[in-house]
Amino acid sequence: MPKLKTHSASKKRFRVTATGKIKRGQAWRNHRLISKSRKAKKHHRLGAYVSAAQEATIKKLIPYK
C-alpha cells in the first residue's frame, strides 16, 4: 500500500495529544482586537479540543502525527 500524504494545512493547525485527542487553536484572536475585552482575549489564548464528530476526519488528514 502506498504512503499517505499529510494534508499541509491540517498539520499546521492541529496537534495530537498523548491521549489521542486533537487540539486546535481558538478563533476570534487575529485582528480587530482593540474592540474585544481583555477577558475575551485571554480566554481565547487557550486552545480547544476538536469535537468527536470531526475527530475521525482530521485523523485521516494527519495520519502520521
From Swiss-Prot:
GO terms, molecular function: structural constituent of ribosome
Pfam families: Ribosomal_L35p (PF01632)
GO biological process terms held by the UniProt record: translation
UniProt keyword list: Ribonucleoprotein, Ribosomal protein
Transmembrane segments: none
GO cellular component: cytosolic large ribosomal subunit
PANTHER family: 54S RIBOSOMAL PROTEIN BL35M, LARGE RIBOSOMAL SUBUNIT PROTEIN BL35M
Family according to the record: Belongs to the bacterial ribosomal protein bL35 family.
HAMAP family, alphabetized: Ribosomal_bL35
Protein name: Large ribosomal subunit protein bL35
